[in-house]
């Protein structure tokens, strides 16, 4: 990923996040999903960011349960931490949008890696050709 990549907002709205403490209450959070991260705010004005989950640190999105009232899902990070969320109904479908954003991010990263590898190979070939042209 290059510094010139611009994060575009894919989805914005409310999610409920299960707290990490012993009582595990559900707390409503304002969330903004971009092409690079899921930003979680403690307030609706988005002044106080409580967490930023970079897509590169997310391993997968698991849909745990779908009840009549909520869709429950878990984000699993690359260090195997599980963060539980729920959204009010299927129309919100945050889990699907996050999963698609994750796949798109991984595809962009793979393409960038492939391009970098090809550029490196082409540079190496060019250097070899110049060396061979100088040889007696």
UniProtKB/Swiss-Prot annotation:
The lineage of its organism: Eukaryota, Metazoa, Chordata, Craniata, Vertebrata. It comes from Danio rerio (Zebrafish). Plays a role in regulating placenta growth. May act via its PH domain that competes with other PH domain-containing proteins, thereby preventing their binding to membrane lipids. Keywords: Cytoplasm, Membrane. SMART domains: PH (SM00233). The PH domain binds phosphoinositides with a broad specificity. It may compete with the PH domain of some other proteins, thereby interfering with their binding to phosphatidylinositol 4,5-bisphosphate (PIP2) and phosphatidylinositol 3,4,5-trisphosphate (PIP3). This is Pleckstrin homology-like domain family A member 2. It is found in: Cytoplasm; Membrane. Belongs to the PHLDA2 family. GO terms for cellular component: cytoplasm; membrane. It comes from the Eukaryota.
């Amino acid at each position: 990923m290059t510094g010139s990549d611009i994060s575009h907002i894919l989805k914005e709205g409310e999610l409920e996040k299960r707290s990490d403490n012993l009582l595990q209450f559900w707390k409503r959070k304002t969330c903004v999903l971009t092409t690079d991260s899921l930003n979680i705010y403690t307030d609706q004005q988005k002044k106080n960011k409580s967490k930023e989950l970079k897509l590169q640190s997310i391993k997968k999105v698991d849909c745990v349960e779908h009840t009549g009232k909520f869709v429950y899902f878990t984000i699993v990070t690359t260090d195997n931490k599980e963060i539980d969320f729920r959204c009010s109904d299927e129309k919100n479908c945050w889990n699907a949008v996050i999963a698609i954003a994750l796949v798109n991010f991984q595809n962009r990263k793979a393409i960038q890696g492939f391009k970098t590898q090809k550029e490196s190979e082409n540079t190496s070939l060019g250097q070899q050709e110049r060396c061979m042209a100088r040889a007696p």
